[in-house]
């Protein structure tokens, strides 16, 4: 099936940044196109006029989720939307039951009720038309910017709808920052590489202790570095050693498994600090946040990823759902030859 392009979900306000990233990423793969990116819409549509776009977009820092664009439908008739969508799609598409999605924007969130109510009629119509088959391999997505306008996309099953994770705030967690790290572990870190009991982490700028708390939940001991106080439940944990020190000056004597950093500072300074630890073999892996500048945020991300690669680290960055004006980076130092 010819793919017209991609549908990309993002944080509202970052459409222009994501569009630039998508166009550049497509060009490196020999695919040329353009983006429709309306400010504050929380989604971007990349279109390849030649119809030669890959089925799915590559990993993009500023995309929460990406779908292969099948078609766009406008002026859907009220009362017969489901039938109109089913009629526009080929039989035997081989997709699981569809997900109804709306943009995560001020304009899009009021459509949540419509999407919930429309789900059953859409599933019935698509199944009756022979479009969906219940296969678990890929899923149909219907994205509604408004109730009469629909983008139809296809993506592998199992992803979060619209890239929004369904994570619950743990009752005993000291801060909501725990959700940011939890999402990063799910989205950026392959399961075999995630923290496990017996490993040790350093958490720079730890207070009040959200990231430290989550690492302890996973059985990892933690050195928490912050001049400020930790929450009582974190400070009293025997698996936590609190160092009242400056995050930029603290160093360990040996190597640690994990380096964590959610310090509010200039992104260049945070990136430099992470590079120092990884270059000196003080940490095997790092998860850190970069607070984004107002202008050209993609530049600092790409520069950081380039610099990490130069010191032998494999890295990926993402603007998570629980991130705000920031991106989260996961970097892991490649094993040395002597370790094999």
Please give the residue ranges for each predicted region:
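SAM-dependent transferase fold signal centered on methyltransferase-like domains
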Residues: 1-340
């Amino acid at each position: 099936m010819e793919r017209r392009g991609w549908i990309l979900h993002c944080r509202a306000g970052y459409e222009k940044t994501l569009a630039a990233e998508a166009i550049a990423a497509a060009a490196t793969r020999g695919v040329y196109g353009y983006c429709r990116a309306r400010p504050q819409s929380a989604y971007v549509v990349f279109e390849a006029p030649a119809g030669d776009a890959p089925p799915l977009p590559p990993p993009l820092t500023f995309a929460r989720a990406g779908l292969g664009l099948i078609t766009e439908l406008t002026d859907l008739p009220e009362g017969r939307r489901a039938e109109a969508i089913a009629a526009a799609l080929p039989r035997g598409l081989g997709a699981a039951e569809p997900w109804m999605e709306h943009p995560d924007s001020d304009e899009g969130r009021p459509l949540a009720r419509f999407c919930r109510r429309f789900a059953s009629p859409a599933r019935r119509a698509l199944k009756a038309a022979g479009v969906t088959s219940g296969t678990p391999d890929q899923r149909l997505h219907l994205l509604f910017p408004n109730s009469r306008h629909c983008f139809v996309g296809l993506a592998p099953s199992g992803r979060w709808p619209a890239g929004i994770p369904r994570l619950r705030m743990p009752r005993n967690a000291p801060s909501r920052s725990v959700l940011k790290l939890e999402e990063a572990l799910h989205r950026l870190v392959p399961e075999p590489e995630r923290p496990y009991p017996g490993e040790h982490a350093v958490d720079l700028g730890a207070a009040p202790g959200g990231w430290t708390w989550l690492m302890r939940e996973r059985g990892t001991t933690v050195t928490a570095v912050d001049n400020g106080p930790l929450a009582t439940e974190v400070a009293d944990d025997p698996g936590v050693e609190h160092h009242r020190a400056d995050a930029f000056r603290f160093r360990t004597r040996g190597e640690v498994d994990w380096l964590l950093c959610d310090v509010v500072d200039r992104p260049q300074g945070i990136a430099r600090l992470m590079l120092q630890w990884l270059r000196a073999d003080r940490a095997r892996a790092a998860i850190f946040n970069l607070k984004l500048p107002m202008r050209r945020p993609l530049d600092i991300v790409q520069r950081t990823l380039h610099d990490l690669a130069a010191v032998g680290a494999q890295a990926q960055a993402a603007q998570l759902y629980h991130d705000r004006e920031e991106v989260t980076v996961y970097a892991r130092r490649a094993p040395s030859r002597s370790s094999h």
